[in-house]
Amino acid sequence: EKAKKKNYIFNLKSADNNQASLLRSGLLLAGANSTLVNTTSNSEDGILTALEIANMNLSHLNLVVLSACDTGLGELTYDGVSGIQKGFKKAGAKSMLITLGKVDDKATQILMTFFYKNLCAGMNKHEALNNAQNSLRKYNNQIYSDPKYWAKFILVDALE
């Protein structure tokens, strides 16, 4: 119930001033397969680029979660890293949870479940992530205690 009152976007699978680098990052949506094999002829290609995102008004979003692999990576430009996260930032998203590398699907699913439960319980974003990471480390006889399972998730601009 509490989560319904928040303005969040969650991305479970994904794929600046420099427009070219914003065109090289994006989210693959329905229809992207056809575009990638050149079998589509409509204007909706199923690829939402960081440039398209940057041109949206997302200033109402408190948190964007990009929990797929490498969502915090991008091209290094004079004003920072330019990638999908830069598109959301330019669009006005107030904060993001991103990843800094390859992530394990099962561990990510468990971590995100803990994270969302913590948010719904009233924790702020930092507390929710920290608690979720600690819970994942202890989960099921500590099978996810290695930092490769939990340390690649970071919050950006999540000042509270």
Where are these regions (language model features)?
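Catalytic cores of enzymes
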Residues: 1-160
